[in-house]
């Protein structure tokens, strides 16, 4: 009887300890390693791409850098773990990366079935179609019989099938795995159409020698809320990634920028003081230093600065804010309060 009681007590203790160890795992691993590993795309202009020197840049990369700034105090301490649409979740769940900052749509099956935890939307998007002007097409409903470049392992693959079926059309699928492969097949004429998120189409078109000869058709056929993800089972790490994104949005709401963040430490706005770590203990509650959000803004800026620098109207990508404007300016970007 005593042996049975002891055995049950040991099992109960093990079950109690287990989750606590898992919860602290990723943060401790990143701090010990001194480098944050971000699962990113193989290369999408404006979002995640290596420059001439091999340094990774872009919208998603800046959010990776923001996370490193929050956790390690140094935005440069990152490693880009490249992935295709097929391999991105496998690499994250296998522990090859710490967080996924990649053009990835939040869906029920990915959240529940693939065992990912999503942390808000850093880009509101939708699926579109890119065609050559010479094709003479003005609407996606004129694409019956077209050959279409489509990336495998993506929501766009399923959306395409649904859209053509619903409109009584047929198509030839030209399957590809990377954006570069799609670009090559599209420009060579192997496919008449390239379909993916509209932001990705704008990014791809910006790399053409004759972008004016290509158009994105007016139809947007899906909702594609893109956001960061982590593995299930690590609540502390989930909280950190969630509030990294929220910090950049709140900073824009409050008018805090890379240029004025030091001055804003003397603000009379209590929420600004909490965000920048002048007051409160929010950094400690996350397991970070109290200046974690200050480090983000000082290193990469607020959400608007990240957007405009990488993909905004004054870049080759040329994307307007649209749905990604702040809620106070007609958009959907909105952060819960820092309270």
Task: Mark where each language-model region is.
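Bacterial N-terminal signal peptides that target proteins for export
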Residues: 1-8
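Cleavable N-terminal signal peptides
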Residues: 10-12, 22, 30
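Sec/Tat signal peptide C-region and signal peptidase I cleavage site
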Residues: 17-24
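Extracytoplasmic small-molecule ligand-binding "clamshell" domains
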Residues: 24-25, 31-101, 286-291, 296-299, ...
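Extended ligand-binding regions for polar small-molecule ligands
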Residues: 62-65, 69-71, 134-137, 141, ...
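Acidic, polar ligand-binding/catalytic clefts
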Residues: 65, 69, 73, 77-142, ...
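C-terminal functional modules
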Residues: 280-339
């Amino acid at each position: 009887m005593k042996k049975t009681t002891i055995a049950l007590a040991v099992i109960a203790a093990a079950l109690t300890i287990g989750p606590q160890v898992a919860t602290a795992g990723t943060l401790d691993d990143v701090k010990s390693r001194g480098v944050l590993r971000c699962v990113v795309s193989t290369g999408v202009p404006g979002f995640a791409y290596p420059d001439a020197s091999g340094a990774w840049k872009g919208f998603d990369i800046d959010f990776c850098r923001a996370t490193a700034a929050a956790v390690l105090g140094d935005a440069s301490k990152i490693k880009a773990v490249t992935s295709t649409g097929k391999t991105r979740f496998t690499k994250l769940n296998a522990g090859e990366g710490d967080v996924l900052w990649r053009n990835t749509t939040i869906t029920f099956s990915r959240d529940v079935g693939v065992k990912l935890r999503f942390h808000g939307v850093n880009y509101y998007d939708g699926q579109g179609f890119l065609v050559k002007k010479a094709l003479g097409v003005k609407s996606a409903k004129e694409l019956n019989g077209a050959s279409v470049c489509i990336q495998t392992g993506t929501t766009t693959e399923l959306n395409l099938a649904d859209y053509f079926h619903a409109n009584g059309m047929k198509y030839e699928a030209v399957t590809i795995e990377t954006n570069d492969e799609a670009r090559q097949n599209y420009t060579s004429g192997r496919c008449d159409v390239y379909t993916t998120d509209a932001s990705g189409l704008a990014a791809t078109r910006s790399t053409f020698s004759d972008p004016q000869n290509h158009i994105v058709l007016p139809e947007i056929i899906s909702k594609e809320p893109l956001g960061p993800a982590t593995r299930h089972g690590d609540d502390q790490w989930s909280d950190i990634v969630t509030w990294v994104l929220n910090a950049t949005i709140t900073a824009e709401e409050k008018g805090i920028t890379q240029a004025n963040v030091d001055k804003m430490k003397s603000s009379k706005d209590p929420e600004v003081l909490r965000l920048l770590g002048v007051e409160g203990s929010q950094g400690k509650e996350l397991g970070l230093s109290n200046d974690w959000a200050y480090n983000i803004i000082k290193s990469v800026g607020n959400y608007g600065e990240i957007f405009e620098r990488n993909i905004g109207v004054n870049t080759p990508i040329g994307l307007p804010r649209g749905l990604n404007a702040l809620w106070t300016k007609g958009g959907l970007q909105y952060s819960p309060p820092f309270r």
